[in-house]
């Protein structure tokens, strides 16, 4: 089920029922360009809706870039969990190389009412991707297992899997795009698999050209997408329909 809405996200989100979204995965405006659409959303009003819509253990996954990242994290320290780094394949900022490093990353900021540590009473939904089974399970000290890693080893004290995700994600930059800030489909699919399960509902309240919606459809998730610009909305609608 996909529900696509052409309108102002701060108004349209008011119509979404409380606790109805398993995850919110979105690429909001960073306010770092001169583009008309690149204006930072009123974060206080945004959080008023997101905190109401998200489920108690759901993840809110927002892409960002400095200085917007700092502003975003500071806007809701209570729910902030951690940041991921998306390392791109192409750097930007060549004209400034004599004054500062080229930029080759963006941030992905994770928020939730749920916890993200051993012993959390309400753990945030999280499915680590890319795990590999160890040919020979590793024996863990019983004391260290009970104290720190009881969630990744069996009661017998053996760790059976490895290759747990790190905080830097490497996905190639998008080649030909239909939106200036379009994210790689593979990156969005990775985030969806990490923070949701099949059949669950994802909200993208500034969906742009609809990449998150395409990823959600590919992976059997339900999707709610909101986009203000009518031209990008039509592009998103066509891309999701064709997926």
Question: Residue spans of the language-model regions?
Answer:
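Short, conserved SAM-binding/catalytic segment
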Residues: 237-243
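Core catalytic lobe of class I
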Residues: 2-224, 231-234
């Amino acid at each position: 089920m996909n529900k696509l809405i052409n309108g102002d996200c701060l108004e349209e989100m008011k119509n979404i029922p409380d606790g109805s979204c398993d995850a919110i995965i979105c690429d909001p405006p960073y306010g770092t360009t001169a583009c008309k659409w690149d204006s930072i959303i009123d974060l206080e009003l945004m959080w008023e809706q997101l905190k109401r819509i998200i489920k108690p253990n759901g993840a809110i996954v927002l892409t960002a870039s400095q200085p917007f990242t700092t502003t975003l994290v500071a806007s809701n320290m209570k729910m902030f969990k951690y940041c991921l780094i998306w390392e791109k394949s192409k750097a930007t900022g060549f004209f400034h190389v004599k004054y500062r490093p080229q930029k080759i990353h963006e941030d992905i900021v994770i928020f939730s009412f749920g916890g993200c540590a051993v012993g959390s009473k309400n753990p945030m939904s999280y499915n680590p991707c890319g795990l590999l089974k160890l040919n020979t399970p590793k024996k863990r000290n019983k004391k260290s297992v009970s104290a720190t890693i009881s969630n990744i080893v069996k009661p017998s004290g053996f760790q059976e899997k490895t290759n747990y995700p790190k905080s830097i994600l490497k996905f190639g930059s998008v080649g030909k795009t239909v939106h200036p800030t379009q994210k790689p489909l593979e990156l969005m699919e990775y985030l969806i698999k990490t923070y949701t399960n099949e059949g669950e509902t994802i909200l993208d309240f500034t969906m742009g050209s609809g990449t998150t919606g395409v990823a959600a459809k590919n992976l059997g998730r339900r999707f709610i997408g909101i986009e203000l610009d009518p031209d990008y909305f039509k592009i998103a609608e066509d891309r999701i329909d064709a997926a």
